[in-house]
């Protein structure tokens, strides 16, 4: 079995953490789901685009998927910052997610800027 890259590991961890947070928040206050949905979509899109890039049809397709993942990571960071200020995400989880995203953004940036 092929070794999983650090980028894939981090994007999987991001996805797992955001899904767990989302499921918990929806049980607490379903009425707020429209505020939580954008983070769920953008965070899971990071990993999905990284996974798609592994099967890219060309170098241009690969770079495009990684650029989309980079943009989605930036959007995820935006939502985390605002949901933390709104007290929808606790500081410990926020710090963990922001650290993961910083690592992911750095790795993606170095990949797309080659």
What are these regions (language model features)?
Residues 1-114:
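Amphipathic alpha-helical assembly/interaction segments
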